[in-house]
């Protein structure tokens, strides 16, 4: 066996068989207001 990967499958891959998908952001970052509120809550405790 060689250390090099077999690229024959990659070379003949047909991109037209892929279907388009819509990505959706699942892990949104908190807003600045939310971060500030959490900081204030932690400081007062």
Swiss-Prot record:
Neuroblastoma-specific. InterPro entries: Beta-thymosin (IPR001152), Beta-thymosin_sf (IPR038386). GO terms for molecular function: actin monomer binding. Keywords: Actin-binding, Cytoplasm, Cytoskeleton. Gene3D superfamilies: Single helix bin (1.20.5.520). It is found in: Cytoplasm, Cytoskeleton. SMART domains: THY. PANTHER family: THYMOSIN BETA, THYMOSIN BETA-15A-RELATED. Belongs to the thymosin beta family. GO terms for biological process: actin filament organization; regulation of cell migration. Plays an important role in the organization of the cytoskeleton. Binds to and sequesters actin monomers (G actin) and therefore inhibits actin polymerization. It holds the Pfam family Thymosin. GO terms for cellular component: cytoplasm; cytoskeleton. Residues 1-45 are annotated as: Disordered. The gene is TMSB15A. Residues 1-27, 35-45 have a biased composition (Basic and acidic residues). PROSITE patterns: THYMOSIN_B4. This is Thymosin beta-15A. Induction: Down-regulated by TGFB1.
């Amino acid at each position: 066996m060689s250390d090099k990967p077999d690229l024959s499958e990659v070379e003949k891959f047909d991109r037209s068989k892929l279907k388009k998908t819509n990505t959706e952001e699942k892990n949104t970052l908190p807003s600045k207001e939310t971060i500030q509120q959490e900081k204030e809550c932690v400081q007062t405790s």
